[in-house]
Amino acid sequence: FVHWGGTPVDLDGIKEVVELAYERFGFRPMVIEDAAHAIGAEWKGRRIGSLESGNICVFSTQAIKHLTTGDGGIITLPNKELYKRCKLLRWYGIDRDKRNYQGKDFRLESDVTEYGFKMHMNDLSATLGLANLPHLDRILAGHRANAEFYNKALQGVNGVTLLEPPEGGLSSYWIYTFHVQNKMDFIAF
């Protein structure tokens, strides 16, 4: 599911669905939270991706996001097994722990255990992200202040419906989203 525009979904509702699946089918499906827009968003006082949910959570740190590394992202994982698997897949499936440099065994089959991808962050991008991290709360406060301005300005405008986060949710407002009944009338307004 997607925390669209930085607005968190009802995580309690998602948890209910997971528990219902367990009751009916005997397993708890793994949930992946698409939090590309939602770094700094909160559900019931806890930041999205804090692992309280037990879900996999992915964030974007692309150039125009709240926290940027130029490009790339962050993944939070609920257990060590998934961490090891993601670490393996991020660099072509190379298992660096299986390399045998002492015995000079540099054969490909000795360290590539499965096909992977090139999805690791380089040091320069990571440094950029770490340098931006202390500014995240200030950036979030600015986006939330802008959203409050829009809420006041659009309150009561005919044909406009403001979209509020679900009760217990605090949006990061990467995107300010609202609904208009008639787009052309709104543009003319």
Q: Which role does the model predict for each range below?
A:
Residues F1-T69, I74-L82:
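Active-site phosphate-binding strand-loop segment of PLP-dependent enzymes
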Residues F1-V2, T7-E16, L20, R24-G26, ...:
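PLP-dependent aminotransferase class I/II
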